[in-house]
């Protein structure tokens, strides 16, 4: 069976006396990636027009826009300060209207998951055994998000004599979850203007300027940011494992007296790590104070 949180729960039964029995169960799941048609969000043309209307209405920004050609607000700021001619501003504005970056396509994917379980059971007059192995893999909708889990169980009953029985049970699991560090791809795709380009004309990453607050370098006002570069240079991974062993010894000394000894061993481990490399904006804004 499958638990609600996505973890495979493997249940085995005692083998029946006779020949060995092998069973397999598996399932697959697919979920389409999100698309802009599923949301009420502006395209790049609507976003530029909205900014124009807001400026014409006399609305003010919470923070003054950073001068740059990568955003309408930044280009307008350059035009107002005389760093861009009217023709240059109109050309930039018209270009930004046509960018229409599909962030959902760049940052999400069709989710695919699959579960598999193989069990082997068997028994004789002296031995009863049940073995099972399960595997679960899921690629999340956000590119770079995935999980894997492997489970195994072995249960053996030894009838050493008419009055002595030993039960051994071993359970083991291992899993890996990969994710992000400081980046929320889906939220970024749904909240970032589509008039911002992800790539330059030559195919290289396009970096727009973000406000920088770095206490050791007050002269630098902004820093470059590209979410694809950030995802390549940051991340997180959690590895888990567990092992459980139980032992049960029963000795029927008399019809009314049975000696029983029960013991067990349990081991659990979790290794969690997150990272940001030197090319990431996270490192530049936190430690370096300037672009790579």
Per-region residue spans from a language model:
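Outer-membrane beta-barrel channels and translocator barrels
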Residues: 17, 124-125, 161-163, 252-254
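Residues on the lipid-exposed face of transmembrane beta-strands in outer-membrane beta-barrel proteins
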Residues: 12, 24, 118-122, 152-158, ...
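An active-site-proximal structural segment forming one wall of the substrate-binding cleft
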Residues: 257
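Outer-membrane beta-barrel initiation region
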Residues: 37, 107-110, 120-124
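A beta-strand signature from Gram-negative outer-membrane beta-barrel systems
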Residues: 1-23, 82, 108, 113-115, ...
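Surface-exposed loop/interface segments of Gram-negative outer-membrane beta-barrel transport/assembly proteins
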Residues: 17-99, 110, 140-147, 151-242, ...
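Surface-exposed cleft-lining segments at the edges of enzyme active sites
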Residues: 103-105
